[in-house]
Amino acid sequence: MKKQILRAVFLSFSLLFIGLANIAAQEGDSKAVAGGGVMVKGWTGKIDAKEQTAGLTLNSAKLSQDGKALHVTTGPATTYWNPKNVAKGDYTVSATFLEPKYMSLNDHPHPYGIVIGGSDLGTDQESYLYCAAYGNGTYIVRGFGPKPFQMGGRAPAKDDAVAKAAGVGQPVTQLIAVTVKGDKVSCSINNKVVATFDKSAVVAAGKLKSTDGVYGIRFAHNTDATVTGLKVTKAK
C-alpha cells in the first residue's frame, strides 16, 4: 500500500514538473536587442519587473521612429509612453499595429496593444490597463495595479475580428482601440468591440486608480512591429 502511495506521489510530482517545464518553454527567454534604447524624443518606457530580475534593462528593447511610424523591437516585455499623452473623461485611444513578419523573433505568438489610464508610470506603484492582440486571432485585456491582473480571464480570447497572419513570416495588421465612455470601458479590434467591462471593475483596489491618465503602447517580449496613427479622440 505504501509503495502504491509513493508511486502516486512520484507520478504527481513528475506531471507537475513536466507541466511547469512546458509553461517555461512556451514563455521563453527574452533576448536583448542590439543597439536598444528609447530613441523617440519625449518618450520613455519601463520593462516588466520579472524582466528586471533577469538582468535586462530598458536598453534591452528598442523604440525608434521610421517616418511617421513608431518601431518597437523587444527584448523584454516593455510599455512605452510620452508623459504629455494624457486622456481624460470619455475618450478613445487607438492605433494601427503592423507585425511585418509574424513571429519573426519567437516560436509562438506574442501580443501588442494600447495602454490607458497610466498612473505613476515608471515607478513601483504604476497602474495601467491594456488591450493587446496576437497575430493568431486572439486578444487579452490585462493591466498592472501594480501587480499584474487580468480582465475576463487569464487565457487569450478568440474573436473573428482579430486578424490572423497567413503564416510565420507573413504580415498581420491590427487596429486596436480602447474606449472609456460613461461607466464602461471597452476594447475594439479592427472596428469591432471584443470586450466591455464596468468601469467599477476596472477602477478598483489592485487595478486602475482612474481611467484618466497617460496612454501609450505595450509589447510582449521578443516581438517586432510598428505603430501608426496613435491618437486620442472624444468617445462617440
Question: Residue locations for each model-derived region?
Answer:
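Short, aromatic/His-centered strand-loop micro-motif at the edge of beta-sheets
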Residues: F149-L175
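Bacterial N-terminal signal peptides that target proteins for export
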Residues: M1-F10
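Carbohydrate-binding surfaces in secreted/extracellular proteins
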Residues: A95, G169-A201
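Bacterial N-terminal signal peptides
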Residues: V9-A21
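Secretory/extracellular carbohydrate-interaction modules
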Residues: T74-Q150
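Flexible glycan-contacting loops in extracellular carbohydrate-active proteins
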Residues: F197-T228
